């Protein structure tokens, strides 16, 4: 990220994993000044993520909030 920032190159984080990786990308991205976007599979927000966690992803004007709460802000379902 620092090398990209030095040369004015935007950085993109890529996540096609689960809610833990998504939360980690959001927290990391919040601290990268040259972040362009976090790429993810939006269909997972309503299908895959609710099976594994209680995390609710709310897209607002193309933006995602950084999860809050202890740790990364993700609570896994024990039944998953």
Range-by-range predicted roles:
Residues 79-80:
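Intrinsic disorder at enzyme termini
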Residues 1-70:
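Shared catalytic-loop signature of beta/alpha-barrel
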Residues 76:
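Charged, cofactor-coupling segments
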């Amino acid at each position: 990220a620092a090398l990209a920032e030095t040369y004015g190159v935007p950085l993109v984080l890529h996540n096609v994993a689960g809610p833990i990786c998504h939360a980690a990308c959001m927290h990391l991205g919040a601290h990268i000044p040259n972040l362009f976007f976090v790429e993810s599979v939006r269909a997972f927000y309503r299908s895959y993520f609710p099976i594994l966690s209680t995390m609710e992803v709310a897209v607002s004007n193309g933006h995602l909030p950084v999860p809050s709460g202890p740790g990364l802000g993700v609570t896994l379902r024990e039944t998953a």
